[in-house]
Amino acid sequence: ITVPSAKLGTPFNEEVEHLQRLVALAHKEGVQVNIRNQSDCLAADPDTITVLCDNVDNLGLAFDPSVYVCGSEVGKDPEKLIKYIRHLYLRDSSPDNYQVRVGQGTVDYGQLVHTLNKMQYRRAMSVDIVPQEGIEHSAEMRKMRLLLESLL
């Protein structure tokens, strides 16, 4: 399951204790808990995510690369997060827009897939494209599928 992390300003130790309790309960039932990296949350900065995952046994990351293309975390290097990724959200983004048409953004899917392959990533991927007025959603989904198939 994917859970949001606490908002910025939440005491770090409080969030660690909360996640430890949640992960321990889920782990007993065979459920993987992942935090999603999101702007304006503790799980936005790659260094903070690393410390959270290192301090909460069995905690994974539901990774959205768009956070590092558009938003408060632009320019931060998420490479160190690869080993924690248990789920991947995919959409194309630009520095000005969290979601753009597939192929018009700056998410480097080739590099992302290459890095995940090196780490032998064999987990979930979700295409997370929200329908937009004037854009055929099914065409955008097909383009993303074709892009991913060409890279895998």
Residue ranges of model-derived segments:
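A cross-domain feature marking catalytic cores of carbohydrate-active enzymes
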Residues: 3-5, 35-39, 63-67, 90-92, ...
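Hydrophobic, aromatic-enriched interface-forming segments
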Residues: 34-49
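Short, small-residue-enriched loops and turns at beta-alpha junctions
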Residues: 8-12, 39-43, 67-71, 132-134
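Histidine-acidic metal/acid-base catalytic patches
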Residues: 24, 29, 46-59, 69-152
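Hydrophobic alpha-helical segments and helix pairs
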Residues: 1-14, 18-19
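Short secondary-structure boundary/capping elements
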Residues: 14-17, 41-44, 107-108
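A short, structure-level motif marking secondary-structure boundaries and short turns
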Residues: 6-9, 35, 96-99
